[in-house]
Design a protein with these regions (language model features):
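Short acidic, Gly/Ser-rich segments with clustered Asp/Glu that frequently serve as metal-coordination loops
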Residues: 17-22
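Active-site-adjacent betaalpha module
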Residues: 2-6, 57-198
Length: 198
């Protein structure tokens, strides 16, 4: 099944000022994360950023900071353990439901998340990305953007991708996400997105 912009949310994990310089192919990863954020903004895909211990690792890099609301600050390696699931559910679930206001909560039909596809980019792939994805997979369809994630070493990054694939996460690339969001060359944002990748 193709990734739909109307059912997607983009999560940028820990792309922080003091962490990025130590990352394998960090500049390329940042460029792809920025492409995702720019396309997400064009297509009205909600963007969430996380920050791991910002007092020590710095804040989200300036290139990405303006694309999302306040970052989810965390100490757990898995953002799913520090409020990300609730945040994504709040963003993707409409406030209205078909339940009568007087109906007891235990009888009410749960509201479905209208944005269950989570697109993940960030660092480090074998720590915070991996643990966050594992924590999200029970509730969401998770797509890990392999050319927008990294670790300090290539070996750790690749081991994370092997494990994530074995666990059932969808491994994609930046261009796969962008072109699936577009579907065809007649999309109103096709030329703008095409400029992002040339």
């Amino acid at each position: 099944m193709l990734i739909e912009p109307t059912s997607s949310q983009l999560v940028l994990i820990d792309i922080q000022t003091k962490l990025l310089p130590a990352m394998f192919q960090g500049a390329d990863v940042l460029a792809n994360a920025l492409r995702l954020a720019q396309a997400a903004r064009l297509m009205r895909v909600p963007i969430t950023v996380t920050e791991q211990y910002p007092q020590g690792l710095g804040h989200t890099v300036p290139e990405l900071a303006d694309y999302a609301r306040e970052p989810l600050v965390k100490m757990a390696f898995s953002a799913a353990d520090d409020g990300l699931i609730e945040l994504l559910n709040d963003i993707g679930t409409p406030k209205a439901s078909n339940n009568a206001k007087s109906m007891p909560k235990h009888l009410q039909k749960p509201r479905e998340n209208e944005r269950p596809e989570i697109i993940i980019a960030g660092m480090e792939a074998h720590v915070c990305v991996l643990q966050t994805v594992m924590g999200l997979m029970e509730d969401f369809d998770v797509h890990v953007v392999t050319d927008a994630c990294t670790s300090r070493t290539e070996r750790n990054r690749d081991a994370a991708y092997d494990r994530l694939a074995a666990e059932g996460a969808s491994l994609v690339t930046t261009e796969m996400v962008l072109f699936e969001w577009l579907h065809n060359a007649e999309h109103e944002h096709f030329k703008a997105v095409q400029r992002l990748i040339k």
